[in-house]
């Protein structure tokens, strides 16, 4: 991604989820220092509408999706971006909407 000069953006909800899992003040500050170098993007009205559509489409197909995953997917779609993730739930979500995933290069 960096090699291809793609902008890196972190959704605000991902920043929150990441820092919520930190157990010490020192680790929290260290994580915040690392993440502060990235642009943080916040969901807007259109992102929330798209997330609702994604959840609805998932549920119609019998797929369980969290609201947080749906908002992350929606923000990525609305930015015409690619999502870098190791969470398999997004692979499932990408099959029912226009979510593009970043493909890791094989070694």
Locate each region found by the language model.
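Active-site neighborhoods of divalent-metal-dependent phosphate/nucleic-acid chemistry enzymes
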Residues: 39-86
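A generic structural signal for alpha->beta connector loops
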Residues: 5-7, 37, 80, 98
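Acidic, PIN/NYN-like endoribonuclease modules and their adjacent C-terminal/linker elements
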Residues: 78-107
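A short acidic, often aromatic-flanked loop/helix-cap motif at beta-alpha or helix-coil junctions
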Residues: 16-17, 46-50, 106-107
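Positions that flank functional sites
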Residues: 16, 50, 73, 91-92, ...
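PIN/NYN-family metal-dependent endoribonuclease catalytic core
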Residues: 1-24, 41-43
